[in-house]
């Protein structure tokens, strides 16, 4: 579609596609634009058909699988030589995990026995798939700086969390202490 305002980054939709991980389990979700909602609310339905703005379904990775993959990714990258720089590149994972843990299905999943079993399966899958960082495959998760020294690590990461996430968010981001506490609680479930 032609944009009225050129160079406005807010006029773009970013779709992330990951080809590294196993895309299962997935679930179909309906994508419905705010423009569609606005046109319905203002009784301008004729534009929906005219501009092909109808909702559509897309297969997306389940929330539970997303949560597990983000946790495993953080563990893996924590074994880089420069942990702070490496984890800084994944800072959005902390934000995502925080919001996933606001979802009732994710809360119940994390409390279940299946959580640790599936975490271990994804961890093993990543050990087989990814050689970087060097030597990480033979290390126990209990050796991860995210477990051994998270408070110190988070002190070095929280500024990146505040600045980077605030730049992308349309509303205030969650308090970094709440995000850290959420992550620590998740780590307790995999130790």
Task: Name each region found by the language model.
Residues 1-191:
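Structured mid-to-C-terminal alpha-helical surface segments
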């Amino acid at each position: 579609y032609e944009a009225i305002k050129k160079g406005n980054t807010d006029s773009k939709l970013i779709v992330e596609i990951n080809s590294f991980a196993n895309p299962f389990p997935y679930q179909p979700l309906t994508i419905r634009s705010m423009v569609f909602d606005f046109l319905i609310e203002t009784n301008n339905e004729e534009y929906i058909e005219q501009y092909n703005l109808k909702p559509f379904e897309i297969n997306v990775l389940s929330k539970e699988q997303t949560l597990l993959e983000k946790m495993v990714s953080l563990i893996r990258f924590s074994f880089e030589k420069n942990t702070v720089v490496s984890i800084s590149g994944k800072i959005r994972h902390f934000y995502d995990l925080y919001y996933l843990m606001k979802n009732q299905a994710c809360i119940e999943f994390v409390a279940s026995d299946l959580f640790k079993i599936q975490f271990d399966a994804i961890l093993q899958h990543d050990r087989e798939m990814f050689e970087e960082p060097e030597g990480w495959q033979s290390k126990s998760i209990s050796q991860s700086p995210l477990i051994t020294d998270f408070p110190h690590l988070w002190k070095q990461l929280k500024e990146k969390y505040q600045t980077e996430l605030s730049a992308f968010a349309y509303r205030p981001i969650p308090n970094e202490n709440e995000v850290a506490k959420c992550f620590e609680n998740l780590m307790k479930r995999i130790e």
